[in-house]
Amino acid sequence: MAKDDVIQMQGEVQENLPNATFRVKLENGHVVLGHISGKMRMHYIRILPGDKVTVELTPYDLSRARIVFRAK
């Protein structure tokens, strides 16, 4: 899968789940399971419920996402 194949969307974190996983509600109303990207883990970026985030979805599984950015 090339980097061009990902779908970027905005969303809001609804709740924390175990293992750095979050329930994220997207702009279009869908709710997906999101995990933190490796760079965010390395830099200890914390995510709390209510934070606005940017997620990447693959066309293969639209129920899971990777959280790549937390808006301030």
Swiss-Prot record:
GO cellular component: cytosol
S1-like domain: residues covered: 1-72
Superkingdom of origin organism: Bacteria
Subcellular location: Cytoplasm
Keywords: Cytoplasm, Initiation factor, Protein biosynthesis, RNA-binding, rRNA-binding
GO molecular function, one term: ribosome binding
CDD domains, per database record: S1_IF1
Reported function: One of the essential components for the initiation of protein synthesis. Stabilizes the binding of IF-2 and IF-3 on the 30S subunit to which N-formylmethionyl-tRNA(fMet) subsequently binds. Helps modulate mRNA selection, yielding the 30S pre-initiation complex (PIC). Upon addition of the 50S ribosomal subunit IF-1, IF-2 and IF-3 are released leaving the mature 70S translation initiation complex.
UniProt subunit comment: Component of the 30S ribosomal translation pre-initiation complex which assembles on the 30S ribosome in the order IF-2 and IF-3, IF-1 and N-formylmethionyl-tRNA(fMet); mRNA recruitment can occur at any time during PIC assembly.
UniProt record similarity statement: Belongs to the IF-1 family.
The name this protein goes by in its record: Translation initiation factor IF-1 1
